[in-house]
């Protein structure tokens, strides 16, 4: 009986592709909105958000390649599952502590988070950015009073 190495190599290649973490790849910053935690009169300065919307970042195993502060060399990725209170470094939980009538689940839903928990990618980067996943192709992060939506490319 004669065996071919091609099917074995093919299966190994498919398994390797399937093992890639879901967050790796190129993501486009699709939009930015003022974070629900903003409570000062007026709106925060949108100049930074305007420079980021439309840009891309690429998450690789060894770096996050992106504009300005979004870039990071040598990230220490950790995927965690968190409740709505934990989104955006606990901003919703802080709002709830300040005002007991705040419904954290409703706040999260305004940004697309409808489940009891969400997957979040902690990067371990100096910029302290975490990426929270609405679904496999949509993630969000907070930076300077804005929530940015990323779409996988």
Residue ranges, per PLM feature:
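Bacterial N-terminal signal peptides that target proteins for export
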Residues: 1-7
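N-terminal signal peptide c-region/cleavage motif recognized by signal peptidases
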Residues: 13-15
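Contiguous, well-ordered beta-strand patches that form the walls/edges
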Residues: 33-36, 59-129
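Edge beta-strand at a domain terminus
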Residues: 71-86, 133-153
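Short hydrophobic/aromatic-rich beta-strand segments that constitute the beta-sheet cores
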Residues: 29, 64-67, 139-142
């Amino acid at each position: 009986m004669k065996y071919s190495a091609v099917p074995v190599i093919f299966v190994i290649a498919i398994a390797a592709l399937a093992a890639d973490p879901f967050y790796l790849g190129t993501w486009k910053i699709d939009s930015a909105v003022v974070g629900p935690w903003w409570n000062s009169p007026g709106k925060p300065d949108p100049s930074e958000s305007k420079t980021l919307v439309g840009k891309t970042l690429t998450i690789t195993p060894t770096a996050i390649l992106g504009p300005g502060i979004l870039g990071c060399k040598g990230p220490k990725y950790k995927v965690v599952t968190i409740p709505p209170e934990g989104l955006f470094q606990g901003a919703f939980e802080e709002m709830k502590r300040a005002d007991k009538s705040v419904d954290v689940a409703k706040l999260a839903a305004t940004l697309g988070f409808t489940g009891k928990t969400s997957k979040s990618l902690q990067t371990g980067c100096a910029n302290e950015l975490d990426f929270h996943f609405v679904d496999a192709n949509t993630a969000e992060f907070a930076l300077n009073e804005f929530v940015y939506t990323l779409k996988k490319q």
